[in-house]
Regions:
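Acidic, surface-exposed loops and disordered segments
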Residues: 1-250
Length: 250
């Protein structure tokens, strides 16, 4: 992957069409990624319709690229297809449980990342929307997802109309552990996060938000305890609704 060291998220796109032929080739190539038991426990819902993008937008906090991108792809953990196959072949599927969701979610995310790598090699720009798991029920309703199908990732896809700066990354020393996991000392934390904390844009974030540290930007503004707990509860309810967890009545 020659472009991996220069990849960045793209949030602005040109009007140039992303052809169905190209998308289908990328989907076929991405399907060669790793998958549990060769079951391919994922589905991709392609959205080009302005009307459906409008309906999806609130689930992604109305981020403008959802409506501006030529293509929006919602990738789902999918045990519905495999379950239907089993039922039609006199087999007893036992996939309405949390482990099966985790297996399907892993398959779906592997497929998603492989698709991203392939698409970026073709020159396409993408943005991975983590908001998919924040309000999944809205996406489920909009896309008419049946039981045992759960949205786990969304991509906005198009030809880039911007070239944003590369974002920083932690050094490998911060996340690679040899033989066993090693706890982080205060000195190591200081070392690993020093470069990130020193970036002018991050120092400005801290200043304009009247915070003491960059970490407080994450805990107090971007990913708060209140939001995490509320959206966790919503995600669990969606898993129940989709049949991956027992309901309170069961």
């Amino acid at each position: 992957m020659k472009n991996i060291n220069t990849r960045r998220s793209i949030r602005k796109y040109s009007d140039k069409e992303v052809s169905e032929k190209l998308l289908n080739r990328l989907f076929a190539e991405a399907s060669r990624t790793q998958t549990m038991g060769n079951m391919q426990l994922y589905s991709a819902v392609v959205t080009r319709s302005e009307e459906v993008k409008e309906q999806l937008s609130p689930a992604h906090f109305n981020q403008p690229m959802v409506k501006q991108a030529p293509v929006v792809i919602t990738i789902c953990a999918d045990f519905r297809r495999s379950t239907d196959w089993c039922l039609q072949r006199n087999a007893d599927p036992g996939y309405n449980n949390f482990l099966s969701f985790m297996n399907a979610a892993t398959d779906a995310l592997l497929f998603t990342q492989t698709f991203c790598n392939l698409a970026e090699e073709e020159g396409l720009g993408l943005c991975f929307l983590g908001t998919t798991v924040y309000m999944p029920q809205m996406i489920i309703d909009t896309l008419h997802l049946p039981k045992l199908v759960m949205p786990v990732a969304t991509l906005t896809v198009g030809w880039p109309a911007e070239e944003p700066a590369l974002t920083d990354r932690l050094s490998t020393a911060a996340f690679v552990h040899q033989e066993t996991y090693h706890e982080y000392t205060p000195e190591a934390i200081d070392e690993y996060y020093a470069e990130k904390e020193a970036l002018p844009e991050n120092r400005e974030f801290v200043k304009i938000n009247h915070k003491q540290t960059l970490a407080q930007i994450f805990t107090d503004i971007r990913y708060t305890r209140k939001d995490n707990e509320a959206m966790s509860a919503g995600f669990i309810e969606a898993l129940k609704h989709q049949g991956f967890l027992p309901t309170d009545e069961e």
